[in-house]
Design a protein with these regions (language model features):
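Ribonuclease/tRNase effector modules and their secretory precursors
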Residues: 1-143
Length: 143
């Protein structure tokens, strides 16, 4: 699985200066979480393709919110609770010729657990939603 290459890495969320690590539990949770299992169609495809941009998604995340741990099964892995951050990512839409026609932009929530070792670990990406007003063309990236 693509995510395994990130295990052990860390990124700083620029808006908060939080260091977020990629733990060994991310690949399994990302692929098989309750949220992932509910996804269909374009959102399922978006989550699968978003995996390759996780380092960048962490760096640009903002709007941090804290939530206490509510499930006993997470007492150890999220001893100090959870943080969620808003992030964005873009996926190309291709023409029949294979050229990129435009990019679809998605908004998502990064779910981060605050573990017993006092580190923050990315746990899952959730609430993926296409931003209907945000499309940009390939040439927008070069200007």
């Amino acid at each position: 699985m693509y995510l395994k290459q990130y295990v052990g890495e860390a990124r700083i969320i620029k808006s908060t200066n939080d260091m977020v690590y990629i733990g060994t539990d991310l690949p399994e949770e990302y692929a098989h979480s309750n949220y992932t299992n509910t996804l269909k169609g374009a959102n399922a495809k978006a989550k699968a393709n978003a995996a390759q941009g996780i380092p960048e998604m962490l760096m640009i995340a903002d709007e941090r919110e804290y939530e206490k741990n509510r499930k006993t099964k997470h007492i150890k892995d999220a001893k100090y609770g959870w943080y969620s951050y808003v992030t964005r990512f873009a996926l190309p839409v291709y023409e029949e010729t294979g050229d990129i026609e435009r990019y679809n932009v998605f908004r998502a929530i990064l779910l981060v657990r605050h573990a017993e070792d006092k580190r923050l670990y990315l746990y899952d990406i959730m609430k993926i939603k296409k931003e209907t007003s945000t499309h940009f063309q390939p040439e927008d990236l070069t200007q």
